[in-house]
């Protein structure tokens, strides 16, 4: 399963997904921007949730293939 598949199966509240420098997956309810600390995305005081690695293993989620800064994806409507 790809990250985009998981996002589209999640609650419609979650609009975006991205990974950080360590490969952790996050869902956001609004479009985030890259943090000044250069390790992940910021949620601009909106809500974000980290997807636990155990959940990743359960659903066999493929890691993002590429630079984490290019990992931001939007939910399909």
Tell me what each language-model feature is:
Residues 1-10:
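Surface-exposed ligand/attachment interfaces on beta-rich extracellular proteins
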Residues 12-16, 22-25:
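Short, surface-exposed beta-edge/turn micro-motifs
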Residues 18-19, 31, 43, 49:
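Intrinsic disorder/low-complexity segments
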Residues 24-34, 38:
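Short, surface-exposed terminal/edge motifs of secreted or surface/virion proteins that either
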